[in-house]
């Protein structure tokens, strides 16, 4: 009985560890890549399917994936998507190519982009420059954040030295964090769980909010990294931005259900199965056609959906739209004299959420972050159980605005005050360096474990990838159609100015900079609304068509139409008979500027300016044309490399080890290993299934090897080794999920039949999630869907006139169907049953085995000659195919 109890306990422990290893949140994996060298020397490759799991919320600079091939780093990088998928970024071939929203992305951030605007002067909330503080901060940057290859090497040495001592501390920290860091998932505590964060998260938020004080990248692109995500839009509970390690509770939908809504097909990107792309494009919500003008205002009308339950809200989410109201036009003096005129239009949810998101702390101008917003809720203090101070690897793509928590302790109080000013809503002042309560003391493992245990899920960082939105009252455009940066920064609007008078959006001089391009409020509002509601930017094609088709041609507030010299000459003439601008007392306090600070034409009211422009256009109508602002280069996602890019990788024939790694500040480095196989255009491939073909059964073949039990068919390793010795390449194709790549790859390396191992070959798995693959293979029993897509893609890498697949091994009729669809001759399709009986599809009555087929390897799989492209000059007429064809049926009546 003791033996039985010990065995049962061992099985339970092993299964528990196995379950932890296949947790969907940690399912990182990499599917092997096949590169085929063509006859002309060019290259073609299969898609790079790489997935990272449980990385939390990342900022754009931390979404860069480094690649190492055969132990050497290559000058090639990937980017991380919202669902953990990795992809390459390439420029579109056509300048105005229309891209689907799920393919649109931004370029990979590089180190140079973060050093462009270092010399930008800091501005106080009142608008005064502080050169002394700017110089102090630039000095800190020069001494603290600029890193060289030698410093990177030192960090690697320290990291290796620290790695051995940190393992024990990580286990203790994660165990202690589960007791102290409590994340609630009940419906009553949802709001409190999102609002009440520890002092660690508060410090991280403050650090993240202060980063735009130092740097504003000049290159912004109007396309985000968002794709069809299963995460549904919920009403935000807090007005402050989420930190880099913040979790959001999703009680309405479990992890299993949310994962089942994702579909990731071969060669594509993850998509939501709730609403397909076609349904999204064909679905027309109940909205009214809106003609934008200078007097167009935007107001959110609260609908009855707020009172619907969580379940009913999911069903009605598609029909919930924001109504845009166009009020009657009024004079500028009336608008600006009443600061609360626009505030009355804005409902409380809009004030606390939308406006704060428009002026998100990560994307405010320099002066807007001098003090924290007053609406930010004080965060509760949480004592950190871990005193661990790790040295993480710093990615070369993280710009100088990244600062490590250990470095914060060494900052002087004056410099630290620039990063972390006192919050207005916090009761009492907090002393700056608290050695034991700093946010970095808590290990990231504890946060991840708490999320996995409590049912929470780390949000994708589509919200963290919002653009840099800046407001200014500079007004107008120069003759070349662009606004100078100095003029824009001179009249920038701070948070306090906007908070005191939200009616600034009605000011005709308001200019909004998004993606380094300048808009007025009528055009910027839909873009900001899309970012807030859907966490996605409007596609470039939509913005361009909106500018071309919807923009009024006779409006003084649309600044995307080029002013000709004749227009600029007529404007001063028409201004001579006009009244002067209203006095400064009628304007809001935030819009008052020193004398001579603005051009004369910007002091006129909106009605006067529009009338003047309309008169000038009426006198001399000139056909206008859109003016492109900033860079017109767009970028799209890709899973394949071009021939030139593959040539730079310097692959050698056969397997090449590849490692994909991503480094974050708070979670260290996550690595994912795979193999790139370089084959020739005339190679012959043997396809082999895994579950039920190499193993004795489908289900037990995945479980028993993890328990140490050999569940492999006898003689298969020897057979495959003999076939490989004759010059054939092996391809292992299974419908398992990408998250089981490491487990499956380890099993193939583990198989050993009396010293004979399986030949190495690419492992082709389904890129979908674990539960989707399990549902397709076990419940639907249609694994051939994936196999046909995958094998057809591999087949297309070779010459069109060649058939790369020579033979195939499987265990089900589904496998036979898939192999037949990709062109494998049925005389070389073999299936095996759980008893180990091998059956040839052409002669099903003749049963054999792996051992017997090994004796006929030289005949069935003859040695491939290097001078020939196949085993025989005419393989279709060999003695194993042609002479074994059935005798054709002949109608005796026709012979008589």
From Swiss-Prot:
Record region (N-LIP): 1-108
Sequence motif: DXDXT motif, positions: 689-693
EC number, UniProt record: 3.1.3.4
Biased composition (Basic residues): 152-162, 387-396
Key words, A-Z: Congenital dyserythropoietic anemia, Cytoplasm, Disease variant, Endoplasmic reticulum, Fatty acid metabolism, Hereditary hemolytic anemia, Hydrolase, Lipid metabolism, Membrane, Nucleus, Phosphoprotein, Transcription, Transcription regulation
One biological process term in Gene Ontology: lipid metabolic process
Chain ranges for the short sequence motif Nuclear localization signal as given in the UniProt record: 153-158
Subcellular locations according to the entry: Nucleus; Cytoplasm, Cytosol; Endoplasmic reticulum membrane
EC class (word): hydrolase
Function: Acts as a magnesium-dependent phosphatidate phosphatase enzyme which catalyzes the conversion of phosphatidic acid to diacylglycerol during triglyceride, phosphatidylcholine and phosphatidylethanolamine biosynthesis in the endoplasmic reticulum membrane. Plays important roles in controlling the metabolism of fatty acids at different levels. Also acts as a nuclear transcriptional coactivator for PPARGC1A to modulate lipid metabolism.
Free-text domain note: Contains 1 Asp-Xaa-Asp-Xaa-Thr (DXDXT) motif, a catalytic motif known to be essential for phosphatidate phosphatase activity. Contains one Leu-Xaa-Xaa-Ile-Leu (LXXIL) motif, a motif known to be a transcriptional binding motif.
Disease as annotated in the protein's UniProt record: Majeed syndrome: An autosomal recessive syndrome characterized by chronic recurrent multifocal osteomyelitis that is of early onset with a lifelong course, congenital dyserythropoietic anemia that presents as hypochromic, microcytic anemia during the first year of life and ranges from mild to transfusion-dependent, and transient inflammatory dermatosis, often manifesting as Sweet syndrome (neutrophilic skin infiltration).
Similarity comment: family membership: Belongs to the lipin family.
Name of protein: Phosphatidate phosphatase LPIN2
Taxonomic classification: Eukaryota, Metazoa, Chordata, Craniata, Vertebrata
